């Protein structure tokens, strides 16, 4: 089956920050970028041809679970992306990045159309993110990312999202998981009520 070619000039990828050894001038030029390219079934050169930016321009160090992230800088740089980029589709890599664009409490793989653009909230590609430990999550992420980058919409009946929590979070925060489901169902209702 012939698949639509990925038009790199219409795509933007936004990450958190460069890795400890990463070059701040080359967003997603390391292992995380290679993982995204592999999942998207695009060459690394095609990935580099897309618009790319880190919301924090320098590695900020470590915290308990993953890297530190400066939300104030992230918010400013997210606003710059919205004002400066002329792309149709933007992949937001991780929950911190999604929050800087104003998307809170949405699951991974949620697609949002707003500001005349489409956004995909994609799991952070690093190995620290346990979401990637389940094969079905990776399979679903790969399928959705490929469709999104080609400009296709998710067909009806295709699961749009899965669990965004790790096992330890799920067992310790049952109430939070229920709130997430409520957010998703409210969002679906509002789409259908618009007509």
Please annotate each region the language model reported.
Residues 130-175, 181-195:
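Charged phosphate-binding loop/patch that engages nucleotide di/tri-phosphates or the phosphate backbone
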Residues 1-110, 114-131, 135-155:
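A polyanion-binding, active-site-adjacent surface
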């Amino acid at each position: 089956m012939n698949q639509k070619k990925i038009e790199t000039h219409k795509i933007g990828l936004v990450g958190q920050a460069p890795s400890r050894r990463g070059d701040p001038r080359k967003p997603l030029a390391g292992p995380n970028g290679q993982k995204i390219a592999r999942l998207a079934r695009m060459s690394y050169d095609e990935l580099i041809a897309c618009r790319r930016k880190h919301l924090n321009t320098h590695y900020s160090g470590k915290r308990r679970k993953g890297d530190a992230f400066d939300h104030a800088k992230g918010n400013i740089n997210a606003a710059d992306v919205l004002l400066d980029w002329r792309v149709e589709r933007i992949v937001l890599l991780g929950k911190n990045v999604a929050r800087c664009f104003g998307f809170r409490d949405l699951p991974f793989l949620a697609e949002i159309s707003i500001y005349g653009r489409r956004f995909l909230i994609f799991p952070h590609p690093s190995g620290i993110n346990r979401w990637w430990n389940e094969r079905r999550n990776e399979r679903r992420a790969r399928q959705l990312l490929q469709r999104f980058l080609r400009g296709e919409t998710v067909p009806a009946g295709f699961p749009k999202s899965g669990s965004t929590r790790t096992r330890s979070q799920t067992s310790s925060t049952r109430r939070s998981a229920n709130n997430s489901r409520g957010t998703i169902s409210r969002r679906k209702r509002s789409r259908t009520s618009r007509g």
